[in-house]
């Protein structure tokens, strides 16, 4: 949820991590 400190591959296009998750 909080991509502010959780740089995971969420469904939030907030950074490269988000993009990577979408591709996967």
Curated annotation (Swiss-Prot):
May serve as a metalloproteinase inhibitor during glandular storage. Their inhibition may be instantly disengaged, by dilution or physiochemical change, when venom is injected into tissue of the victim. The keyword Lipid biosynthesis does not apply. Keywords: Metalloenzyme inhibitor, Metalloprotease inhibitor, Protease inhibitor, Secreted. This is Poly-His-poly-Gly peptide 1. GO terms for molecular function: peptidase inhibitor activity. GO terms for cellular component: extracellular region. It comes from Atheris squamigera. Belongs to the pHpG family. Residues 14-24 have a biased composition (Gly residues). It is found in: Secreted. Expressed by the venom gland. Residues 1-24 are annotated as: Disordered. Residues 1-13 have a biased composition (Basic residues). The lineage of its organism: Eukaryota, Metazoa, Chordata, Craniata, Vertebrata.
